[in-house]
A protein has these predicted regions:
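Short, well-ordered amphipathic alpha-helical segments that serve as non-catalytic structural scaffolds
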Residues: 7, 74, 110-112
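Subtilisin-like serine protease catalytic core
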Residues: 15-28, 32-46, 54-106, 122-125, ...
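Substrate-binding/access-modulating region of protease and related hydrolase catalytic domains
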Residues: 96-178
Length: 178
């Protein structure tokens, strides 16, 4: 993030002390999981594995750990130099993608439904969904995925989804990012 701040000549000095550090916020990350890292110590409050059904926290890809670091790493491992956007947020990790970054609609829906069912238990405010269905998904499945995402939104949860996973060309932004 520091490289971005340098590039745009903005260091957030006007907001650095504001209450936008993730305190009192819970973020659910649906991705490849999370490898335990010092930057997340004491803040992972829930885990669900929709791919392999395991119970212990893990990430067999690294993508989920990277995304979670951008969102909520506290910079502890680097003496505070490299932290995420919400370094005090509590985290719920839902593994919906395998080691190759692939996942089925069934796994993604299972993860979204688990988040919806457990939203009050964990106090989930934000969901990050780093997935995009391949273009050409059958319309009933596309609608089911969109409905599940909209159900989270209608419950008052801010939902952030990836867009452009398959490139910048026309038709490459797939559901749910479209």
């Amino acid at each position: 993030m520091n490289h971005v701040k340098q590039a745009v000549h903005y260091w957030c000095s006007d907001t650095i002390e504001a209450m936008n550090n993730g305190r009192d916020v819970c973020v659910a990350v649906l991705d490849t999981g999370l490898a335990m890292h010092p930057d997340f110590t004491g803040r992972v409050i829930g885990f669900k594995d929709c791919v392999n059904g395991r119970h212990g926290l893990y990430d067999d890809s690294g993508h989920g750990t990277h995304v979670t670091g951008i969102l909520a790493g506290d910079g502890r491992a680097y003496r505070g130099l490299y932290g995420g956007m919400a370094p005090k947020a509590r985290l719920v990790i839902v593994k919906v993608l395998d080691e190759g970054g692939e996942g089925s609609i069934r796994q993604i829906l299972e993860g979204i439904r688990w988040i919806f069912k457990n939203r009050l238990k964990y106090g989930i405010h934000v969901v990050n969904l780093s997935v995009g269905a391949k273009t050409g998904l059958e319309e009933p499945k596309e609608n089911e995925l969109l409905h599940a995402v909209e159900q989270l939104w209608d419950a008052g949860i801010a939902v952030v989804v990836s867009a452009g996973t398959y490139g910048p060309g026309e038709g490459t932004v797939a559901v749910p990012g479209n």
